[in-house]
Every structure is written in structure tokens, then in C-alpha cells.
Amino acid sequence: MNLLQDQPAMGIDQTTLEHLARQWEDLAPEAILAEAVRCFGDKLVLASAFGPESIILLDMLVKVWPRPQAFFLETGFHFPETLALKDRVLARFPQLQLEVVGPLMSVAQQNAIYGERLHDRNPDHCCAIRKVEPLNRALAPYKAWIAGMRREQSPTRGQIGVVQWDSRRGMVKFNPLATWTHKQVWAYIVERDLPYNPLHDEGFPSIGCSPLNCTAPVADGADPRSGRWRGKAKTECGLHA
């Protein structure tokens, strides 16, 4: 458990974290979060789009971090239900220090430069403008971040470690819920009576931006992320891949 603490942040590399991930594979998420807070303090941040996983992580974090830090990427295309949930979460966790980070250009500016419905014609470019660049800016002050990724969510996430090296940004990334199942997530939500997006009750297991070609409902038993970028080869927005 002391491997991170024993090395300066600049000395942590992929090999170190792969070893640590194997050691931590069976640790409870709360223990991983406690270690992350102990090692990185105010250089640690939670990425939250207010999915159930990030709300669970926040509920766990407040037990070990008096004023947890998080950021929310305001793409300009969120469902109204997502924005309403943000307010409910802030009311539930008033100690949360939330930074709202937006793109460098408004939706109107993007439409003027690239034309309307860029998300339909070139979703990678739209995600780069509205998600990836803001994410990189949001993470710049930090040395480590926490995400709600789970292996069960999609094949592209099937090999993630509970802790890993984010080589793109040169920092540590924690995935404390990597081993959790869909059933575990919702059992925790119910047990703790946590707020969640009502769209989950309407067939949306994975919620991103509101255009239906970016986020659509899926059939029972289908891949939870199959409603994202429907009809496209795209499987990730670029935040985690």
C-alpha cells in the first residue's frame, strides 16, 4: 500500500502502476480512494459527468476527504436531466468543490465555423472540441485523477486496472470501481439512497450528450454503451482512450 507514497510523482511510471494495480486488485474502492487522497491530496481530482459511478465515488470520497475536488465538463449539449442532477448532487454533498469546465467555443461559434450537427458528420472532432480539450485543461493543475470506469461497461474498458498510468497526460489515473458489476453499482445506489439520472429508468444505461445519435436508449440486455454514437464505429469520446 505504500508504493505510491514511496516514490515522487515524477518517478511513477507505467510499470510501477501495473505492479500496484495487481496488488490492489481485490481492495475495496474505499481503500483505493483513501490511498489516493493520502498520496496526492489537493493534487487529486474526480472527473464527474454525474453518472452513477461518479456519484458512488463521491459518496465514498467524502468519508476520507473533507472537501473533495471534482470537475464537470459542460459540453453545451447535456440533457436537462443531467443538469438537474448536478444541482441535486451539490445539494446532497455541499462540501464538494466542483469546477465546471466548458469548451473554448460556444455551440453557436462551433456551428458558425464547422456547420451545424458536427456531432453527426464528424463526432471525433466534436468530442475533441467539447470534451477532450476541456478535459486536458481541467486536469492540467493535478497529478492524479479518479474516473468511474468499469471493465464490464464495454470491451474497450475490459482490461483497465484499478490504478494506471495516463500516458497521454503524464499522470496517475484511479479506477476504483473497475471490478464492479452493474448489479453492484445499483445495489449501492439504492442502499445509500443516492440521487441518479432519471433517464436510467427510461432505457439509457450510458448518458452523454443529448443528440440522439450521441446518446440513445438501448434494448434490455444490450451492451450498455451501444446507445452511444449509434451507427458509428466510435466507441469512446476520447476522454479515456
Curated annotation (Swiss-Prot):
Residues 221-241 are annotated as: Disordered. It catalyses: [thioredoxin]-disulfide + sulfite + adenosine 3',5'-bisphosphate + 2 H(+) = [thioredoxin]-dithiol + 3'-phosphoadenylyl sulfate. Its EC number is 1.8.4.8. The keyword Zinc does not apply. One of its GO terms (biological process) is hydrogen sulfide biosynthetic process. The keyword Oxidoreductase applies. Signal peptide: none annotated. Keywords: Cytoplasm, Oxidoreductase. Its main location: cytoplasm. Belongs to the PAPS reductase family. CysH subfamily. Catalyzes the formation of sulfite from phosphoadenosine 5'-phosphosulfate (PAPS) using thioredoxin as an electron donor. This is Phosphoadenosine 5'-phosphosulfate reductase. The lineage of its organism: Bacteria, Bacillati, Cyanobacteriota, Cyanophyceae, Gloeobacterales.
